């Protein structure tokens, strides 16, 4: 079995999905798409505004529709929103149509990356204990969805991409 043509990066907000997916798309010659950017384009609103004006349930429905559309295409690096794993159909869709890579980050690393960001809808008003509970609730879902897990602890974006490329080669050799 060859590697699926789409690669989906999943992980908690602040794990580095956007930075890694950008570099990885350049290195692998694949098109970069972001579920959040697609939603913002379709809605004409920022993610923060969608959460405020229409609620998280509406956002998650849009996220599922965008993922369905993206999975009909090929040759992409899909930068997934941190909560995409919250809906079971998304997990099935990703596993069927993508090689799913989970960027695993330690809570203290996430906190350090997120504390200066105000554009995180589920973080900006939340305290660390709430973030930890949210992360804890998603961990089993990230792990269940992932074909490959990469720790981002103490690694640069380039190091994470190199490790992903190594894992992709290993995955292709063991799967094919």
Curated annotation (Swiss-Prot):
ATP binds at residues 14-19, 120. It catalyses: shikimate + ATP = 3-phosphoshikimate + ADP + H(+). Its cofactor is Mg(2+). Mg(2+) binds at residue 18. The keyword Kinase applies. GO terms for biological process: amino acid biosynthetic process; aromatic amino acid family biosynthetic process; chorismate biosynthetic process. It holds the Pfam family SKI. It is an enzyme of class 2 (transferase). One of its GO terms (molecular function) is shikimate kinase activity. This is Shikimate kinase. It comes from Dehalococcoides mccartyi (strain ATCC BAA-2266 / KCTC 15142 / 195).
